[in-house]
């Protein structure tokens, strides 16, 4: 009976691995200009939607007990994603369920907003390996387009206009003069929180403020949830999108105190530009199931002590050494997992405060660079590595 139960459990792990692949999205080529496309634009009727799953990001834990408790209960979300291109621009539309509309009001520091982001791999000499899913990696940049749901946001504008920064009850004017004052204040408000960033790894994310990226994104909420749209050029100073475009989608839920790393995130997803030659190798990498034996991989992970530094299963005790991996299979490619096993210093994911947990240092500084304290497992045979990758790909949250 014990042998039968073990076989059933092993089969379950193997079957889970078969669900690892992401769909391939076709960016339909249209004759219409996409410069001003929005979520409700008629041109989207030509698009082909695919289901992309977004998993809770749990590799990095916040210094926020309540937020962490909420994140622990978050399930994976299904989003409907479509893309279009007109030969000059690419447009992406993301639809996801969210019953609550959480909007930035700038009236409280503990109110959080809904939002979404689309991440593109930056221009490099070689398309692969892809950047790390979390803000890129050294030599492998990413461009991130972030859109938040906002009402009226007031930010420093450098105009030295103090007169319109005071409370309306302190103006000393009434009637039409007060109405004029209110109108001028309203005109200063920013109702579109759209930002673009470039990054090559943790601590490097930098906002692009010089106008070198021309993009337009927006959000709209309805009974079914949010729709977020983005349009940007296929080519500029930071990206050269052609053939197959790898993208990653993230969404934030303000009701769950979502912000920064507290989000749901997809793995890299391939978008093929209709009418252009696809990158077959990249498509295969992003849409093909892990080839290893997940059951053997779990055994190998335990044998090689992976659970000594990482929280592998959601029910395992937390580790203060390496990042938690109980959702890593949802938002990581097989190539990234393989690289992390063989070259652990290629991407050093932030861990806990080393001063607070001096007995569990997760990196050392060598020649000015962070070097992971993780063992280099390049001594493992190829089959074992592929088995561990297949097992790690099964580690993901339940889909709501």
Residue ranges and their predicted role:
Residues 1-19:
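Gram-negative bacterial Sec-dependent N-terminal signal peptides
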Residues 22-24, 33, 51, 56-185, ...:
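Surface-exposed, glycine/proline- and aromatic-rich loop segments on solvent-exposed faces
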Residues 37, 89-96, 226-232:
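Short, well-ordered beta-strand segments enriched in hydrophobic/aromatic residues
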Residues 156-221:
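Long, low-complexity, polar/charged, intrinsically disordered or flexibly structured peripheral segments
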Residues 218-287:
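Long, compositionally biased interface segments
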Residues 278-302:
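Electrostatic cytochrome c docking/interface patches
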Residues 281-283, 366-400:
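C-terminal capping alpha-helices of c-type cytochrome domains
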Residues 292, 298-327, 331, 343-368, ...:
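Periplasmic/extracellular electron-transfer cofactor-ligation site
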């Amino acid at each position: 009976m014990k042998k039968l139960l073990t076989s059933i459990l092993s089969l379950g792990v193997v079957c889970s691995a078969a669900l690892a692949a992401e769909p391939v999205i076709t960016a339909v080529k249209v004759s219409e200009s996409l410069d001003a496309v929005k979520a409700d634009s008629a041109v989207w009727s030509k698009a082909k939607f695919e289901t992309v799953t977004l998993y809770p990001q749990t590799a990095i834990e916040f210094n926020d007990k309540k937020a962490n408790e909420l994140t622990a209960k978050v399930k994976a979300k299904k989003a409907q994603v479509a893309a279009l291109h007109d030969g000059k621009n690419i447009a992406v539309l993301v639809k996801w369920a969210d019953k609550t509309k959480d909007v930035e009001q700038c009236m409280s520091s503990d109110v959080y907003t809904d939002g979404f982001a689309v991440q593109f791999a930056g221009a490099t000499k070689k398309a692969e390996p892809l950047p790390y899913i979390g803000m890129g990696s050294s030599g492998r940049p990413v461009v991130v387009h972030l859109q938040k749901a906002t009402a009226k946001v007031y930010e420093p504008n450098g105009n030295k206009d103090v007169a319109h920064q005071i409370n309306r009850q302190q103006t000393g004017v009434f009637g039409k003069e007060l109405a004029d004052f209110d109108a001028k204040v309203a005109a200063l408000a920013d109702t579109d929180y759209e930002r673009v960033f470039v990054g090559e790894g943790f601590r490097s994310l930098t906002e692009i403020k010089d106008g070198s990226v021309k993009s337009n994104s927006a959000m709209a909420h309805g009974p079914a949830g949010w729709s977020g749209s983005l349009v940007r050029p296929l080519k500029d100073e930071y990206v050269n999108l052609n053939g197959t475009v790898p993208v990653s989608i993230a969404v934030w839920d303000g009701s769950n105190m979502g912000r920064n790393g507290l989000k749901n995130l997809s793995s890299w997803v391939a978008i093929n530009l209709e009418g252009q030659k696809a990158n077959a190798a990249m498509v295969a990498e992003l849409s093909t199931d892990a080839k290893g034996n997940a059951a053997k991989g779990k055994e190998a992970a335990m044998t090689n002590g992976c659970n000594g530094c990482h929280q592998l299963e959601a029910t395992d005790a937390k580790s203060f050494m390496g990042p938690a991996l109980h959702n890593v299979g949802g938002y990581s490619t097989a190539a990234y997992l393989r690289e992390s096993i063989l070259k652990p210093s290629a991407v050093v994911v932030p861990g806990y405060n080393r001063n607070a947990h001096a007995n569990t240092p997760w990196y050392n500084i060598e020649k000015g660079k962070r070097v992971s304290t993780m063992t280099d497992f390049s001594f493992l045979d190829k089959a074992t590595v592929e088995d561990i990758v297949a097992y790690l790909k099964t580690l993901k949250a339940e889909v709501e």
